[in-house]
């Protein structure tokens, strides 16, 4: 289930303040955040946000297509190493 329309989208206040401050000064710098739950707003477009994946901060450049999604969607927490190889080829 998605979030109620009555409530509106969620974004951590500290992250929103940092973005608004950068937009006011016109600066572009990487913002470190642990807030994977925050929704991406149109004000974020053009900024790079380093989202924590549990081990390191993954830099995510925000584009228009990402608006409405969560920051955590773009910083995977699990590393996929691939499925087991096919043993049929090695037996021959």
Curated annotation (Swiss-Prot):
Keyword rRNA-binding: yes
Gene3D superfamilies registered for this protein in UniProt: 30s Ribosomal Protein S19, Chain A
Function text: Protein S19 forms a complex with S13 that binds strongly to the 16S ribosomal RNA.
Gene Ontology cellular component list: cytoplasm; small ribosomal subunit
Pfam families tied to this protein: Ribosomal_S19
UniProt cross-references to HAMAP family, sorted A to Z: Ribosomal_uS19 (MF_00531)
Keyword DNA damage appears in the UniProt entry: no
Gene: rpsS
Lineage: Bacteria, Bacillati, Bacillota, Bacilli, Bacillales
Protein name as it appears in the record: Small ribosomal subunit protein uS19
One annotated GO molecular function: rRNA binding
Family membership noted in the UniProt record: Belongs to the universal ribosomal protein uS19 family.
Record SUPFAM superfamilies: Ribosomal protein S19
GO biological process entries: ribosomal small subunit assembly; translation
Keywords: Ribonucleoprotein, Ribosomal protein, RNA-binding, rRNA-binding
